[in-house]
C-alpha cells in the first residue's frame, strides 16, 4: 500500500519546526509522497519581513507545495457561522485557494494564485471571468 500525507503549516517558526519533525517521521516510516499547504499567509507581512515567505517555508521543509491559503477575516466569519469558505470561492481569495487545492488533489494542473503581486485580487477576478466565459 502506498501512503500519502499532507502537512499543513502556518508561516510561523513553531509551526514550521513542528512540521519539520512530522516530515522527518513520515519519511522514516517510508512515506515519501508528502505535500505542503501553507495556511493563513499574509503577503503584507511577508513584504515587511515579519512573516516567512512561501519560498522560505518550502525551502525549510523540502516538500512539494499543494497550496497556499491567504489569511482573511472571511474565514473566521464563515467558520463561526459553520459555513464552508469554498462557497465563497468566487468572491474571496481563501475560498478560491481551497477550491484550487481540491482540484490539484483530483489531479488537475492548476496555477497557484499570485498573492504577492499588487492587485492580486484583480487577477483572481480576471481568472474567474475567463473561466466563466469559457464555460458559456
Question: Model-derived features: where do they sit?
Answer:
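Conserved catalytic-core segment of NTP-binding enzymes
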Residues: 1-67, 71, 76-77
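Residue-level detector of alpha-helical recognition elements and their boundaries
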Residues: 34, 90, 113-116
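Short, well-ordered alpha-helical segments
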Residues: 51, 59, 92-99
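A generic structural signal for well-ordered alpha-helical surface patches
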Residues: 55, 73, 96-99, 103
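C-terminal boundary of histidine-terminating zinc-finger modules
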Residues: 81-96
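A short, charged, Gly/Pro-tolerant segment at domain boundaries
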Residues: 100-104, 113-136
Amino acid at each position: 500500500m502506498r501512503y500519502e500525507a499532507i502537512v499543513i503549516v502556518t508561516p510561523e517558526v513553531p509551526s514550521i519546526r513542528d512540521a519539520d519533525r512530522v516530515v522527518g517521521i513520515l519519511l522514516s516510516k517510508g512515506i515519501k509522497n508528502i505535500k505542503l499547504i501553507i495556511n493563513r499567509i499574509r503577503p503584507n507581512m511577508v513584504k515587511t519581513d515579519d512573516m516567512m515567505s512561501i519560498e522560505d517555508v518550502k525551502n525549510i521543509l523540502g516538500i512539494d507545495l499543494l497550496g497556499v491559503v491567504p489569511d482573511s477575516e472571511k474565514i473566521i466569519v464563515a467558520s463561526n457561522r459553520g459555513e464552508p469558505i469554498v462557497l465563497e470561492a468566487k468572491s474571496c481569495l481563501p475560498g478560491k485557494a481551497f477550491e484550487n487545492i481540491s482540484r490539484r488533489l483530483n489531479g488537475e494542473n492548476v496555477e497557484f494564485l499570485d498573492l504577492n503581486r499588487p492587485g492580486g485580487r484583480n487577477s483572481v477576478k480576471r481568472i474567474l471571468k475567463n473561466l466563466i466565459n469559457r464555460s458559456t
